[in-house]
Amino acid sequence: MIQTKSETITREFTTSAKNRGSYWITTFGCQMNKADSERMAGILQAMGYQKAKTELCADLVLYNTCTIRDNAEQKVYSYLGRQAIRKKSSPHLKLVVAGCVAQQEGESLLRRVPELDLVMGPQHANRLEDLLNQVDNGQQVVATEEHLILEDLTAARRDSNICAWVNVIYGCNERCTYCVVPSVRGKEQSREPKAIKLEIEDLAKKGFKEVTLLGQNIDAYGRDLPGISSSGRRENTLTDLLYFIHDINGINRIRFATSHPRYFTTRLIEACAELPKLCEHFHIPFQSGDNEVLKRMGRGYTIEKYRRIIDKIRELMPNSSISSDVIVAFPGEDESQFQNTLKIIREIGFDQVNTAAYSQRPNTPAASWAEQLPESVKIDRLKELNLLVEQTAKDKNTRYHNQIVEVLAEGINPKNQEQLMGRTRTNRLTFFSKIGPKKYSYNPGDLVKVKISEIRAFSLTGSPIQ
């Protein structure tokens, strides 16, 4: 059963679309940021801005930022420095910093880069029009206060017309000791199921074929929504949402990310096995293969629990692909604990792993711990990890050799104009000829049967067979 929050706020934009100049958005970081950028681009176009041909000729430049690692944050300051110099000769330029760096730094960003016009945290993305109107009135604006995220009826300007990101839950209530996300993205706010369904139905009408449901911890979806069944089970879970949206006509594939092992239930796995549109790919970060490290990270599960989740997925969906995230050189991690992480990667056999050496982030407990590891150890462990991850990914991809897979064509291969590129249901990037048997020509948006002839660690190449 699906229930909704009565206090949901919605808003339509009424600003006339007069020509306000051009805009450019640069996005750093995660899928959530990419989805936010698409939404903000839609707002700007509804206001009368047009996308610029290049960043250097834009009248409004917006950086949607990430602070999960220090190097991502420093890159933002490098970009801002160039725009600050440009603004001295182009005073009409509007300069905006959005996202997690904006939320973390707030007014201190204005002191560091006084040329900024607007600093806005991720909870304020849907307020962009109102905030820019304040800038037009001569104000320098900082919007980082905790805020109820508005349902935004303005159509996002999607980077693709085939695959779409759909935010279903904002924020994070976890307290991982290394992570800055809860302090910059705020508390969990689940969207109403009906609003999510309406957005996906609209995407289907526009010809989109695939949606990816997004959340920092997507399987925590609905914890803040009302609804308890007669059996005492919480309603409005991610599982309920998947059943609720599954039969929307026109949508061929459904994905979701990112999952937290603490909330990944057997019922969710069973639903994914039952519902044919759910793709056989699961992104479930494990972060460390050592229980003591997981405990110090504040992750709330053991590696044994993580293994049980993977075992259940492979029991019900043997051909599923599993991707993950891992951090090495966490404060106090010794060599044996690092080896436990490598052991898990070998034994589980991940299709892909996003890797990182631990990075101290402000306002996180682990940043102040005494057991920080030397940079040389971080570099060595990350290098060893990456070599293993690449070899494991290539080994996993061998199962596709000479196999026929379904690929959703997403666009032209930028390195080979004679090829299309897309993804399998298991999320393998695949390249194939635009021309099939009997000189049939395939186009983006087509579901194509492809026989795989070449494998690499992170991609496949083949030929259409139909």
Curated annotation (Swiss-Prot):
<feature type="binding site">
    <location>
        <position position="179"/>
    </location>
    <ligand>
        <name>[4Fe-4S] cluster 2</name>
    </ligand>
</feature>
<keyword id="KW-0411">Iron-sulfur</keyword>
<keyword id="KW-0963">Cytoplasm</keyword>
<feature type="binding site">
    <location>
        <position position="100"/>
    </location>
    <ligand>
        <name>[4Fe-4S] cluster 1</name>
    </ligand>
</feature>
<keyword id="KW-0949">S-adenosyl-L-methionine</keyword>
<feature type="binding site">
    <location>
        <position position="30"/>
    </location>
    <ligand>
        <name>[4Fe-4S] cluster 1</name>
    </ligand>
</feature>
<feature type="binding site">
    <location>
        <position position="172"/>
    </location>
    <ligand>
        <name>[4Fe-4S] cluster 2</name>
    </ligand>
</feature>
<dbReference type="GO" id="GO:0046872">
    <property type="term" value="F:metal ion binding"/>
</dbReference>
<dbReference type="Pfam" id="PF00919">
    <property type="entry name" value="UPF0004"/>
</dbReference>
<keyword id="KW-0408">Iron</keyword>
<dbReference type="GO" id="GO:0005737">
    <property type="term" value="C:cytoplasm"/>
</dbReference>
<dbReference type="InterPro" id="IPR007197">
    <property type="entry name" value="rSAM"/>
</dbReference>
<dbReference type="InterPro" id="IPR020612">
    <property type="entry name" value="Methylthiotransferase_CS"/>
</dbReference>
<comment type="similarity">
    <text>Belongs to the methylthiotransferase family. MiaB subfamily.</text>
</comment>
<dbReference type="InterPro" id="IPR005839">
    <property type="entry name" value="Methylthiotransferase"/>
</dbReference>
<dbReference type="InterPro" id="IPR013848">
    <property type="entry name" value="Methylthiotransferase_N"/>
</dbReference>
<dbReference type="InterPro" id="IPR006638">
    <property type="entry name" value="Elp3/MiaA/NifB-like_rSAM"/>
</dbReference>
<keyword id="KW-0808">Transferase</keyword>
<protein>
    <recommendedName>
        <fullName>tRNA-2-methylthio-N(6)-dimethylallyladenosine synthase</fullName>
        <ecNumber>2.8.4.3</ecNumber>
    </recommendedName>
</protein>
<dbReference type="InterPro" id="IPR038135">
    <property type="entry name" value="Methylthiotransferase_N_sf"/>
</dbReference>
<dbReference type="Pfam" id="PF01938">
    <property type="entry name" value="TRAM"/>
</dbReference>
<keyword id="KW-0479">Metal-binding</keyword>
<feature type="domain" description="MTTase N-terminal">
    <location>
        <begin position="21"/>
        <end position="137"/>
    </location>
</feature>
<dbReference type="GO" id="GO:0051539">
    <property type="term" value="F:4 iron, 4 sulfur cluster binding"/>
</dbReference>
<keyword id="KW-0819">tRNA processing</keyword>
<comment type="function">
    <text>Catalyzes the methylthiolation of N6-(dimethylallyl)adenosine (i(6)A), leading to the formation of 2-methylthio-N6-(dimethylallyl)adenosine (ms(2)i(6)A) at position 37 in tRNAs that read codons beginning with uridine.</text>
</comment>
<comment type="subunit">
    <text>Monomer.</text>
</comment>
<dbReference type="GO" id="GO:0035600">
    <property type="term" value="P:tRNA methylthiolation"/>
</dbReference>
<feature type="domain" description="TRAM">
    <location>
        <begin position="398"/>
        <end position="466"/>
    </location>
</feature>
<feature type="binding site">
    <location>
        <position position="66"/>
    </location>
    <ligand>
        <name>[4Fe-4S] cluster 1</name>
    </ligand>
</feature>
<feature type="domain" description="Radical SAM core">
    <location>
        <begin position="158"/>
        <end position="395"/>
    </location>
</feature>
<dbReference type="Pfam" id="PF04055">
    <property type="entry name" value="Radical_SAM"/>
</dbReference>
<dbReference type="InterPro" id="IPR006463">
    <property type="entry name" value="MiaB_methiolase"/>
</dbReference>
<dbReference type="InterPro" id="IPR002792">
    <property type="entry name" value="TRAM_dom"/>
</dbReference>
<keyword id="KW-0004">4Fe-4S</keyword>
<dbReference type="GO" id="GO:0035596">
    <property type="term" value="F:methylthiotransferase activity"/>
</dbReference>
<feature type="binding site">
    <location>
        <position position="176"/>
    </location>
    <ligand>
        <name>[4Fe-4S] cluster 2</name>
    </ligand>
</feature>
